[in-house]
UniProtKB/Swiss-Prot annotation:
It comes from Bacillus subtilis (strain 168). Signal peptide: none annotated. This is Phosphoribosylformylglycinamidine synthase subunit PurL. One of its GO terms (molecular function) is phosphoribosylformylglycinamidine synthase activity. Gene3D superfamilies: PurM-like C-terminal domain, PurM-like, N-terminal domain. Mg(2+) 1 binds at residues 98, 538. ATP binds at residues 57, 96, 537. Belongs to the FGAMS family. Its EC number is 6.3.5.3. CDD domains: PurL_repeat1 (cd02203), PurL_repeat2 (cd02204). The keyword Magnesium applies.
């Protein structure tokens, strides 16, 4: 494409060509006012990506301000590539979650793969070595051929990238619901480790310092990816396949090692990933954060395609690229390091003091824009908010307990629901043991990695039950944070902080904006009560397909610290004779449950309630008991209720069973009341455990007969099943659905 084909400034305005880039009439008028002139094609392209929701958070900034972002351990909150939390001994953990939803709907393999690559770069751009990847995935019903295709390709893309780069994929979640039929969610989280003195920022400081481009060459892939991520999916979205990037994990591995070596060199001033909006966002953001400007000569940009225009180079989202700022005169030191890895490192510009992004191409100035206008001064919209009509109706609807004729069959049926069923088919494709630090592999409440050279370990998880958020976004937001914390606690860790991925529909619809506001209120309250500040994250809006929105899905990524590896706990029962306890009472709460979805085919009613103070006291008591060595296993009660949680606890390599007595009718086994745990304890610790965890109720014991037996207080048998049979249906459900041609 040659420059001659680009429309003139006048054409852009008169024909409203800017609208095709997602810029509104009001925004164009504001741009004209800021510049005091009409923007050219490259400039309006740059504004369009920087002012997209994906880059500017223009619709969500008022919401994000609600989150608590500071704490005594927080070293870096929102605003950089990733958040950082102190874990003692001069070490810190770096983590962030990001979405790649729209690209994954079109090109599921590359969309998912580049989502993993992008979040890994965010973490190592802070100076940290990535140690783990997690993912949170949502798809439509697994009976649909298209959903099967998306599911298989997304998992293959995550595995293909993560396995090749040598970072273990240690956890995550997959849920299936019809609301994600046309718009799957692919959220990737990366966790890294760093020493305090190695922390780097994405800032272009020091007038005259050199701006260097490192990594892969620039192509035409991913142009307008950020804009594409800021609009609804529709039947015409297939035409935007070129907005999907293509990843090369082997290049990323080299880039990772080279960047970590460069970080040890004091010639490095600033470093940032070329993520969404590529060269545009990295240059404008680095300059704006430092109060400086950047001038670049685009003729010097390494290109893998011929005849690329300034517009294409600045908006490309080609992968595996970083922008560095280096002390002037020390460029060769950096070039030599990248040479070792057979990577390009090219000086393409310098830092200025005029707060402008100035670009030259073929001897002409093709862009001259104020960096603050691009990075910080995008318009912020306070969208109208309106409670949906269904909300009041749900709030006043108490869902009666379903009549269950055969609890045995109901348990088996629930264990085969794809959201509950074993995800072994997924994580068997991931290398979760590479680098040999993984202590708790996928399949328990949280992934756990040891920190070499110390007694410490890190627990990590992602969580969100979007059905609860659909019923009541504020309550659902609280539950999402609380469940993530429960998973961390069950692993023997103290929750440290949160990274959140806010996946919602179109914020221009008042009912959707209401969901976002209320969910943020719930998340904020839970983070305050549980002392887990939000240190960064991502907003993904416009998750709609042909006008239908996904369920509100604010995914919570959480990391916890295990002070001593002796405290590491998993969900599985350990030996016959151990006592089984449930912590927390079970109420008849079936709205939004897996049981309701399976038996009625729809979700309605009043969401399960949560008392955050009670939640906190139970979590603290359980963690105290774990640290004192009283607890053999711990598992949080979530989808499918107590029946499913106990069944999952008996599925071990040993042929264990459990004999349990509970109060109430069979349906209560599948209620999804909150703030509950299933715990096993050695008999000799019974008194000490009960004194520590006052809410714990002794309900039975672990047996050696391989049978799960559950009866009510009258001795009436509700469940009597071989644990190996339960495990067979649980593990076989997803492979069986994928093989069927339905």
């Amino acid at each position: 494409m040659s420059l001659l084909l680009e429309p003139s400034k006048e054409q852009i305005k008169e024909e409203k060509l800017y609208q095709q880039m997602g810029v509104s009439d009001d925004e164009f008028a504001l741009i004209e006012s800021i510049l005091g002139r009409l923007p050219n094609y490259t400039e309006i392209g740059i504004f369009s990506v920087m002012w997209s929701e994906h880059c500017s958070y223009k619709n969500s900034k008022p919401i994000l301000r609600k989150f608590p972002t500071s704490g005594e351990r927080v070293l870096q909150g929102p605003g950089e590539g990733a958040g950082i939390v102190d874990i003692g001994d001069n070490q810190a953990v770096v983590f962030k979650i990001e979405s790649h939803n729209h690209p994954s709907a079109l090109e599921p393999y590359q969309g998912a793969a580049t989502g993993v690559g992008g979040i890994i770069r965010d973490v190592f751009s802070m100076g940290a070595r990535p140690i783990a990847v997690l993912n949170s995935l949502r798809f439509g019903e697994l009976t649909s051929p298209r959903v099967k295709y998306l599911f298989e390709e997304v998992v293959a893309g995550i595995a293909g990238y993560g396995n090749c780069i040598g970072i273990p994929t240690v956890g995550g979640e997959v849920q299936f619901d019809s609301s994600y039929e046309g718009n799957p969610l692919v959220n990737a989280m990366c966790v890294g480790l760093i020493n305090h003195e190695d922390i780097k920022k994405g800032q272009a400081k020091g007038v005259g310092n050199t701006v260097m481009y490192v990594g892969a060459k620039t192509g035409r892939d991913g142009i307008h990816g950020a804009t594409f991520a800021s609009e609804e999916m529709s039947d015409s979205s297939e035409e935007k396949r070129s907005a999907v990037q293509v990843g090369d994990p082997f290049m990323e591995k080299l880039l990772l090692e080279a960047c970590l070596e460069v970080i040890q060199c004091d010639a490095l001033v600033g470093i940032q990933d070329m993520g969404a909006a590529g060269l545009t966002s990295s240059s404008a953001e680095m300059a704006s954060k430092a109060g400086s400007g950047i001038e670049m000569n685009l003729d010097l940009i390494p290109q893998r395609e011929t005849g690329m225009t300034a517009y294409e180079m600045m908006l490309s989202e080609s992968q595996e690229r970083m922008l560095l700022v280096i002390e002037r005169g020390r460029e060769q030191e950096i070039i030599d390091i990248f040479d070792k890895y057979d990577l390009e490192a090219v000086s393409v510009g310098h830092v200025t003091d005029d707060k402008m992004l100035r670009l030259t191409h073929k001897g002409e100035v093709v862009c001259e824009l104020p960096v603050d206008a691009l990075a910080e001064e995008a318009p912020v919209y306070h969208k109208p908010s309106q409670e949906p009509a269904y909300y009041r109706e749900f709030l006043e609807t108490d869902v009666p307990a379903p009549q269950i004729e055969d609890a045995n069959e109901m348990l088996k049926a629930l264990l085969q629901q794809p959201t509950i069923a074993s995800k072994e088919w997924v994580y068997d494709q991931y290398d979760y043991m590479v680098r040999t630090n993984t202590v708790v592999a996928p399949g328990s409440d949280a992934g756990v990695l040891r920190i070499r050279g110390t007694k410490k370990a890190l627990a990590m998880t992602t969580d969100c039950n979007a059905r609860y958020l659909y019923l009541d976004p504020e309550v659902g937001g609280k539950i999402a944070v609380a469940e993530a914390a429960r998973n961390i606690i069950c692993s023997g860790a103290e929750p440290l902080a949160v990274t959140d991925n806010l996946n919602f529909g179109n914020p221009e619809k008042p009912e959707i904006f209401w969901q976002i506001e209320k969910a943020a209120d719930g998340i904020s309250e839970a983070c305050n009560v549980l002392s887990t500040p939000v240190i960064g994250g991502n907003v993904s809006l416009y998750n709609e397909s042909n006008g239908t929105a996904i369920y509100p899905t604010p995914v919570i990524g959480m990391v916890g610290l295990i002070e001593d590896t002796a405290h590491i706990t998993t969900q599985h029962f350990k030996q016959a004779g151990d006592l089984v306890y449930v912590i927390g009472e079970t109420k008849p709460e079936f709205a939004g449950s897996e049981l309701q979805k399976m038996t009625e085919g729809r979700i309605y009613g009043k969401a399960p309630q949560i008392d955050l103070d009670v939640e906190l006291s139970r979590q603290k008591a359980l963690l105290d008991a774990i640290k004192k060595g009283f607890v053999q296993s711990a598992h949080d009660v979530s989808e499918g209720g107590l029946g499913v949680a106990i069944a999952e606890s008996v599925m071990t390599t040993e042929n264990l069973g459990a004999n349990v007595t509970v109060e109430g009718e069979a349906a209560l086994l599948f209620s999804e009341s909150q703030s509950r745990f299933v715990v096993s304890v050695k008999k000799e610790h019974q008194a000490a455990f009960e004194a520590t965890v006052k809410d714990a109720v002794h309900i039975g014991e672990v047996t050696a007969d391989g049978i799960l037996a559950i009866q009510n207080q009258d001795g009436q048998q509700m469940i009597h099943a071989q644990t190996k049979e339960l495990e067979r249906v649980w593990k076989g459900a997803i492979p069986c659905l994928l093989k069927s041609k339905a």
